[in-house]
Amino acid sequence: MVGTLDMDFTKYSALAVEDDAGGMAIIGVMMRYLGMQAYLNTTGDGVVELARAMKPRPDVIFLDINLPKTNGYEILKKIRTDEKLKGVLVVAVTAQDADTEIPKCMAAGFDGFIGKPISRSRFPRQIRRILSGEPVWETY
């Protein structure tokens, strides 16, 4: 699969923040299958600190919008104001209504949007596009 996507994923790292076990499993398995270094967080607590401590720094953060103690918009604000995390791509991942959430995510400064449920067949290509600098704003 890696060869067909024409990208060496092994040089990239990602952080996925997702409170749903099923969604987390799909994201984690897909990133690891591609060869990416993957870190997972299920609550949203300490995301900025975790991202800052990652070695290497994450290239992309997949961030759920609805988390138990906070939301993706609040976490994004913290990421965007952190000097050490400047330039990290942040992609919203949510099951919320795309027609409502995509404009909000764009306005908030997300680098992309992937709707749930995550498609196992499309997710690797979405990751490739994101890491190549192409915005992804897709409902699934």
Segments and roles (model prediction):
Residues A21-L40:
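Two-component/phosphorelay signaling modules centered on CheY-like receiver
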Residues V91-V93:
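Hydrophobic/aromatic residues positioned on beta-strands within the core alpha/beta folds
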Residues P68, K86, A98:
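The feature encodes the CheY-like receiver
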Residues G35-G44, V48-L50, I114:
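Short hydrophobic/Thr-rich beta-strand motif most characteristic of the beta2 strand and flanking loop
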Residues P56-F62, L67:
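Active-site beta3 strand of CheY-like receiver
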